[in-house]
Design a protein with these regions (language model features):
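ABC ATP-binding cassette signature C-motif
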Residues: 1-95, 149-383
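Flexible nucleotide-interacting loop at or near the entrance of a catalytic core
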Residues: 86-177
Length: 383
């Protein structure tokens, strides 16, 4: 659907192209194509996006809507972020100096206003005091959740062994003889346009789906927590958020569980909302709360950034980078993949895979990977 809408918007070479979250539901390859297209697009583009890498690649100007106003910046996302943070810091520092000066003047006035010999100086300082105006720093509309995954148990050397897994769905071989071993320091990104293959692999590893052939084995020191791509069944209940989360906590205390919810921006009575009434972003934050509460040393994420705002994506990204355990994840956000993964597994359309210990950017630039893709494409054409 997204690709069809993009094709409609791009048809006819418009003078102004308006794009509202164009990268939603696009895989990384499609996003890369869109980036290159927009970079070369000669007319005006106005885009709303939560994808930081995409904004850095495409945008030459940023319109920041915050503090009840719109502020324009020349530059890409990173330049805007650094500039906006610098402006706030400078305002706070300037206000601090003004407050110190105000205190100094008030103390002088209070001390010498009744002293005849100092009355002129006191009056002069009163005038100076009246001229000092503090800059109004309005509260930001941006709220950052606190995401910190802390495993309760250190992971051992034997993490996961996958041997010869195959799976056919609706007559299509989604996974074909997949084998890999996961080490204790791996953060593996599942990439490629074969979305069904990635989700099927996650479901098998989470015990939700049986492979047609092959096997897998988790190490005895591992504990797994899984973020599913489709959470419809999970939230099809009238159970309260706090009650649902408590079942995953060793500490069966509502106050303890509410602490996790508070970090994830569920304030006050939000914790007693029913599961089924939550928005897309709230559902994601509840699932991330569950993963934090469980304290697992292996995290599996299947597209966790869907429905999240930029602040939550940034917080999740930082939490994944800091996590001392193993991560297996699929994600449409280039920056999350690049900054988190130290190993790439690409699932190809024919059900096979490419496995490489590298960062995502290095993987994309690799001649070896380009040759492997070319061989695969030639084989497909021959078939």
């Amino acid at each position: 659907k997204v690709k069809v809408l993009l094709a409609q918007a791009l048809f006819g070479n418009p003078d102004i192209l308006l794009l509202d979250e164009p990268t939603n539901h696009l895989d990384l390859d499609a996003i890369s194509w869109l980036e290159e297209f927009l970079i070369n697009f000669e007319n005006t583009v106005i885009v709303v996006s939560h994808d930081r890498y995409f904004l850095n690649k495409v945008c030459t100007n940023i319109a920041d809507i915050d503090y009840g106003k719109i502020q324009l910046y020349a530059g890409n996302y990173d330049f805007w972020y650094e500039s906006s943070q610098l402006i706030v810091r400078q305002m706070k520092e300037a206000n601090k100096k003004k407050e110190e000066k105000i205190k100094e003047l008030q103390e002088f006035i209070q001390r010498f206003s009744a002293n005849a010999s100092k009355s002129k100086q006191a009056t002069s300082r009163k005038r100076a005091l009246e001229k000092i105006q503090l800059d109004e720093i309005r509260p930001s509309s941006r709220k950052y959740p606190y995401i910190d995954f802390r495993p309760e148990r250190e992971i051992g050397n034997d993490v996961l062994f996958v041997e010869g897994i195959s799976k056919t769905i609706d007559g299509v071989k989604v996974l074909d003889n997949i084998s890999f071993t996961v080490n204790h320091d791996d953060k593996i990104a599942f990439v490629g346009g074969n979305e069904l293959a990635k989700t099927t692999m996650f479901k098998i590893l989470a015990g939700e789906l049986e492979p047609d052939e092959g096997s897998y084995k988790w190490g005895v020191t591992t504990s797994q927590s899984y973020f599913p791509k489709d959470n419809t069944a999970i939230f099809d209940t009238d159970e309260l958020i706090v009650d649902w989360l408590t079942q995953y906590s060793e500490i069966k205390d509502a106050t303890y569980v509410r602490g996790f919810l508070g970090r994830m921006l569920f304030a006050g009575e939000d914790g007693v909302k029913k599961m089924r009434v939550l928005s897309g972003g709230e559902k994601v934050r509840v699932l991330l709360s569950r993963m934090m509460i469980m304290g697992s040393n292996v995290l599996m994420f299947d597209e966790p950034t869907d429905h999240l705002d930029m602040e939550s994506i940034t917080a999740l990204n930082n939490g994944m980078i800091k996590f001392p355990g193993v991560i297996l994840f699929a994600c449409r956000d280039h920056q999350v993949v690049q900054t988190t993964a130290n190993r790439i597994i690409e699932f190809l359309p024919n059900g096979s895979m490419i496995d490489k210990i590298t960062t995502y950017d290095e993987y994309l630039a690799s001649d070896e990977m380009a040759k492997k893709r070319h061989v695969y494409q030639m084989n497909e054409e021959d078939n």
